[in-house]
């Protein structure tokens, strides 16, 4: 039990370190060793847990788009136009790997919001980096689309680069670095007689 406590305490401490320094909210990804225990430790440290399991929210990743009848932007439009939001859980998230897909997704979602009462779409910018993310946020703002989306940056986000993310304008940074490879705290137990 000491090993488990040490590991989870290390994750909570690391999450607190990230949450204190990060310019915005920081979330753990699905990549955990101890599952819900890792997620709870991240939560205790001040980070977001993202999804605890797949049923908590709907996340559409590039592999999901690849197996649809349409391809690329057509698949994004088709999915976002017809998705039953009441079945999505806490939120609906779409992973995009390029600027065109991000704009198509935000435009499609905004058009749907104009005729339906819908929450913001979570738009995950995968491997965009701080500079590209900042340009994307600016472009979405200039196009009047920014209010329709929550922007999450993910992919290769490390603690040493947090300062570079400060001015990019994303809402959430998600990374497995919060909980994976975290050094455990040195916990010991003494029994008095």
Spans of model-derived segments:
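Acidic/glycine-rich phosphate/pyrophosphate-binding loops and surrounding catalytic core
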Residues: 1-120, 131-135, 139, 150-152, ...
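Short secondary-structure boundary segments
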Residues: 127, 155, 177
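Catalytic-pocket segment enriched in acidic/His residues
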Residues: 140, 158-159
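His-Asp phosphorelay/catalytic-motif detector in bacterial-type signaling
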Residues: 147
């Amino acid at each position: 039990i000491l090993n488990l406590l040490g590991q989870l305490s290390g994750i909570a401490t690391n999450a607190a370190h990230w949450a204190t320094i990060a310019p915005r909210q920081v979330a753990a990804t699905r990549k955990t060793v101890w599952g819900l225990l890792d997620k709870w430790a991240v939560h205790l440290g001040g980070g977001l847990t993202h999804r605890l399991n797949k049923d908590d929210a709907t996340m559409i990743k590039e592999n999901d788009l690849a197996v649809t009848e349409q391809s690329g932007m057509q698949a994004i439009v088709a999915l976002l136009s017809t998705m039953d939001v009441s079945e999505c859980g806490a939120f609906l998230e779409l992973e995009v790997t390029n600027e065109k897909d991000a704009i198509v997704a935000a435009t499609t979602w905004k058009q749907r919001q104009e005729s339906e009462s819908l929450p913001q779409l979570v738009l995950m910018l995968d491997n965009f980096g701080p500079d590209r993310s900042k340009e994307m946020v600016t472009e979405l703002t200039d196009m009047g689309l920014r209010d329709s989306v929550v922007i999450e940056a993910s992919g290769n986000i490390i603690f040493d680069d947090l300062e570079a993310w400060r001015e990019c304008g994303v809402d959430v940074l998600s990374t497995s670095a919060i909980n994976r490879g975290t050094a455990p705290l040195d916990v010991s137990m003494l029994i008095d007689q």
